[in-house]
C-alpha cells in the first residue's frame, strides 16, 4: 500500500465513519475505483481506531459521567439514575454485534465485501433510512429510554457488519422507528459503537499487516498515519453531524446514498469497475 493510498483511504474513513453513508462501503468503493484493489476489512477496522478515539474524546464528559453513575449505582441503589441505566443499555446493546461479529468474521473479510453487495446495500438501506425519518415521531427523550430500546438498537447495529449499510445509519434509523428524537438516536448509537469498534480494531490489528484475504497491506507507520488522519477528520465529522441533525433531517443523506449507489451500479453493470 502506497502513502497516497493510505492518505486517501484514511480521509474517506474519517469523513464518512459517523455519517449515515457507510464508511466501509466508501472505503471499498474508493479503493476499487482509484487503486483497483480492496483496502480490506482489517485496514478498515484498524483505521476505525482513529475515529473511535475521536468519538471517545467528543463524548468524554458523557462517558465519565455515565461510568461514574454506573459504578455508584452498583454500590448504592439510591444512585441508580438515568446515567446508571444508560450504562447498562450500552452494555446490553453491544452484545448482539459482538456475538455476530465473531461468528461471521470470515464472511465480513471476504464475500460481503463484493462491490455488488456493498452498492446494493447502499441503495436499499436508503429506503430504510427514509422510512424511519418519515414515520419517526421523535417524541421520546433520554429519560424514557428503556432496555428494550437498547436491544433493538443493538440488533440494528449488527447490520453495520455488511459494508454499505452504515453503523450510524442503522442505529439512528432504529432509534427513529422507536420514537426517539433524532439527536438522541445519534448520540446513543455513537455510545453503543464505542466498545464494538474498539474491540474490532484491536482484534484486526495483526491482519492489517498480513491480510488473510487479498486486501492491501499496510506498514506500521502507515497504519499510524491512517489512524491520525481518521481521528482528526472523524472528530470534525461527529461534531458537524450532531449539529446538523438538530435542524435538518436524514433525507439529505438518503439522496446522497442513492446518487452514489446508482452511479456505482452503472459502473459495475458496464464493467467499468470490477466487483471483486
Curated annotation (Swiss-Prot):
Its EC number is 3.6.1.27. It is an enzyme of class 3 (hydrolase). Its main location: membrane. GO terms for cellular component: plasma membrane. It is found in: Cell membrane. It catalyses: di-trans,octa-cis-undecaprenyl diphosphate + H2O = di-trans,octa-cis-undecaprenyl phosphate + phosphate + H(+). It is a multi-pass membrane protein. The chain crosses the membrane at residues 84-104, 115-135, 188-208, 222-242, 250-270. This is Undecaprenyl-diphosphatase. It comes from Mycobacterium bovis (strain ATCC BAA-935 / AF2122/97).
